[in-house]
């Protein structure tokens, strides 16, 4: 599914903080321009995540196929009894706006309607529900007297009656439903992350909400979730049946490459650990280390989904050594904190539009031959 970016330039805030700890010039000496190893590692991780997201297949959700297009109202023959209908009322409608409802019902007004044409109207309403993602909402014709020229159609919004994970019920509106014993989604403590990602029990079922939930769950590499919509016990009720056999909670990695710089050493050593949904909040946590001859970088990151929102944090610490001439040793250290919020504001069959906010704060310290220079702080807000 192609992602549609939503980007907007925002504010850039500078703050210079702290006092020099020794009496030296406030400006740092000219030295080699070195890239922060932690920032480089973060960029490589973000590039890999964007590539994985772009190549991730669309959620697999099994629903009934939509009804085919039908002929015009006048082309539908009525061999039986008909009634002249001049007004059509929809009761219980909470899913179609007034303009859409009028566009569907208008062709049937001021016409003689019988069983065949009324069935066509019900089918057209169902098609309108499905087109907007309300795949379990239905329209019904209640017993009534049509001699007064008014046709009343009852709309029954499809509700989420229960949520099942691998055949076990974890949430339900049915009083006698037996809850699952312990977490079912692969976490040690809870299934809260899966419940947060999927539509809430009692809500009107909408296909885009299901797709968003499956996307949130499958953003973790250990998950390959699929969803089926099963009939519930109550009229209009549906059971969201989530099937997922998660892989390992933890992934370990170690290796070496030659992507370092000449100034600090081309050979890089890498080690990391990733934990996916270890607790049950569908959280992603990672710890990583990258080092060269003269650099070290440690990074910790965490992300937790909540419906259409994803909250994240990344912290980093990096340090480096570099010679200035033959007599001076430059030592630098950088602390970084990044808080992120991603909100999917619209999604359809063509893609999705997301709103992304990050607040980054960095503090850099440099010293030459153990003489500390004035630290520098930078805060950046991106929208």
Question: PLM features: residue spans?
Answer:
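N-terminal signal peptide c-region/cleavage motif recognized by signal peptidases
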Residues: 15-17
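Periplasmic polypeptide-binding modules associated with outer-membrane biogenesis and secretion
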Residues: 22-260, 272, 288-297
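Residue-level detector of the transmembrane beta-barrel scaffold of outer-membrane proteins
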Residues: 164, 226, 241, 251-253, ...
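Hydrophobic, lipid-facing positions within transmembrane beta-strands of outer-membrane proteins
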Residues: 267-273, 296-300, 335-339, 379-383
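Transmembrane beta-strand segments of outer-membrane beta-barrel domains in Gram-negative
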Residues: 310-383
């Amino acid at each position: 599914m192609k992602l549609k970016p939503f980007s907007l330039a925002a504010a850039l805030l500078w703050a210079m903080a702290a006092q020099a700890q020794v009496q030296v010039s406030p400006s740092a000496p000219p030295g080699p321009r070195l890239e922060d190893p932690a920032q480089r590692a973060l960029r490589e991780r973000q590039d890999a995540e964007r590539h994985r997201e772009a190549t991730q297949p669309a959620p697999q959700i099994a629903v009934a196929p939509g009804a085919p297009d039908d002929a015009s109202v006048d082309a539908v023959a009525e061999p039986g009894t008909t009634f002249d209908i001049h007004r059509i009322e929809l009761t219980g409608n909470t899913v179609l706006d007034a303009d859409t409802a009028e566009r569907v019902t208008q062709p049937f007004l001021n016409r003689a309607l019988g069983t065949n044409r009324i069935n066509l109207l019900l089918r057209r309403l169902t098609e309108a529900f499905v087109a907007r993602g309300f795949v379990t909402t239905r329209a019904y014709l209640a017993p009534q007297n049509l001699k007064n020229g008014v046709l009343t159609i009852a709309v029954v919004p499809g509700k989420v009656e229960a949520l099942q994970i691998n055949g076990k019920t974890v949430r339900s509106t049915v009083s006698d439903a037996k809850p699952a014993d312990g977490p079912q989604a692969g976490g040690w403590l809870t299934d809260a992350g899966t419940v947060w990602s999927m539509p809430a029990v009692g809500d009107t079922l909408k296909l885009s909400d299901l797709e968003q939930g499956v996307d949130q769950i499958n953003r973790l590499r250990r998950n390959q979730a699929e969803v089926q919509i099963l009939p519930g016990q109550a009229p209009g009720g549906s059971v969201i049946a989530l099937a997922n056999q998660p892989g390992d909670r933890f992934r370990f990695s170690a290796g070496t490459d030659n992507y370092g710089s000449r100034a600090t050493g081309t050979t890089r050593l890498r080690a990391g650990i990733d934990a996916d949904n270890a607790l049950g909040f569908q959280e992603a946590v990672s710890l990583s280390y990258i080092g060269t001859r003269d650099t070290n970088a440690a990074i910790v990151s965490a992300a937790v989904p909540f419906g259409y929102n994803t909250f994240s944090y990344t912290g980093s610490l990096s340090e480096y050594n570099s010679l200035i001439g033959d007599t001076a040793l430059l030592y630098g250290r950088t602390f970084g904190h990044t808080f992120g919020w991603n909100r999917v504001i619209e999604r359809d069959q063509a893609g999705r539009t997301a709103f992304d906010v990050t607040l980054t704060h960095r503090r850099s310290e440099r010293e030459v031959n153990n003489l500390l220079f004035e630290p520098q702080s930078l805060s950046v807000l991106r929208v």
